[in-house]
UniProtKB/Swiss-Prot annotation:
It holds the Pfam family PRC. It comes from Bacillus velezensis (strain DSM 23117 / BGSC 10A6 / LMG 26770 / FZB42) (Bacillus amyloliquefaciens subsp. plantarum). Belongs to the RimM family. One of its GO terms (cellular component) is ribosome. It is found in: Cytoplasm. The lineage of its organism: Bacteria, Bacillati, Bacillota, Bacilli, Bacillales. This is Ribosome maturation factor RimM. Residues 98-171 form the PRC barrel domain.
Length: 174
């Protein structure tokens, strides 16, 4: 089994009597990830092995995703799943378009200016709205907030874990 797992949601409660669970999604690809027939893995805190489940139904309800699993068709069978984290193995992530990246590929990358000056390392990605914002940790200075927009991010090399940016005036506090 895989060594790398990626969080795609968390079961926060049950819903109704038909074995549905309420999920807070942690993926940008919920429709794809929770599609009936897909395999997901449920991780309980402290458990040695995940529980492998197959999605049998998926629907939206308010701000939650409601999932049913083929292996657990009743409320009694899903009650113990509360607070479990839903993950997928790395090989199930799927391919992205040419200029799209998974967060785990960006986090940890070095950020340099167009002049080659080291700015810092991406430590977190925020998703406030129109575009993502990368939080860049800098040695001995405040974190820099870098918008993921074409006028700022000039090159991303995932293999070298290096990102080149155009430092606009006022973008980075000294």
């Amino acid at each position: 089994m895989t060594n790398r797992w990626f969080n795609v949601g968390k079961i926060v409660n049950t819903h109704g009597i038909k074995g549905e669970v309420r999920v807070i999604s942690k993926t940008d690809f919920a429709e794809e990830r929770y599609k009936p027939g897909n395999t997901l893995y449920l991780f309980a805190e402290g458990a040695a092995e995940p529980i492998k489940v197959t999605v049998s139904a998926h629907r939206l309800h308010k701000q939650f995703h409601l999932l049913q699993f083929k292996e657990m068709p009743s409320l009694n069978e899903v009650e113990h799943l509360r607070n479990m984290v839903i993950k997928v193995p790395e090989e199930d992530l799927g391919e992205l378009e040419e200029d799209e990246f998974y967060f785990h590929e960006i986090i940890g990358c070095e950020v340099v200016s167009e002049d080659g000056e080291l700015i810092g390392t991406v430590k977190e990605i925020l998703t406030p709205g129109a575009n993502d914002v990368w939080v860049v940790a800098r040695k001995g200075k405040k974190d820099a907030l870098i918008p993921y927009i074409a006028s700022v991010v000039k090159d991303i090399n995932i293999n070298e874990k290096k990102i080149k940016i155009h430092v606009m005036e006022g973008l980075i506090d000294e």
